[in-house]
């Protein structure tokens, strides 16, 4: 993996795996109430994430607090993956 190849050079390789985040790119989905609700229901918090909620994870992985973390995917998906991970689109 890239993490194992670059680790000896002190490079850490990690990723953030966000759930559904309220951004301009997701506005088309958000504008359709059935679809918005279907995505929100997959989070254990029953809502979409804000961009601000992604920042802490990025800061952590970029900081010295994660100096021994590499080759990791950090799921910031409101529990979607832990609860189920599947998506059933609304019937419209």
Predicted regions and their residues:
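Active-site helix adjacent to the Tyr-X3-Lys
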Residues: 1
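C-terminal tail/cap regions
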Residues: 66-69, 74-92
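Short, conserved catalytic or interaction motifs in soluble domains
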Residues: 8, 18, 63
């Amino acid at each position: 993996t890239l993490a194992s190849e670059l680790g000896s050079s002190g490079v850490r390789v990690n990723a953030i795996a966000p759930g559904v985040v309220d951004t301009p790119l997701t506005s088309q989905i958000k504008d359709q109430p059935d679809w918005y609700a279907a995505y929100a229901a997959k989070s254990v918090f029953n809502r979409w994430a804000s961009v601000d909620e992604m920042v802490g994870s990025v800061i952590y992985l970029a900081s010295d607090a994660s100096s021994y973390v590499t080759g990791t995917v950090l799921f910031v998906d409101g529990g979607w993956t832990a609860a189920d991970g599947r998506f059933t689109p609304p019937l419209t």
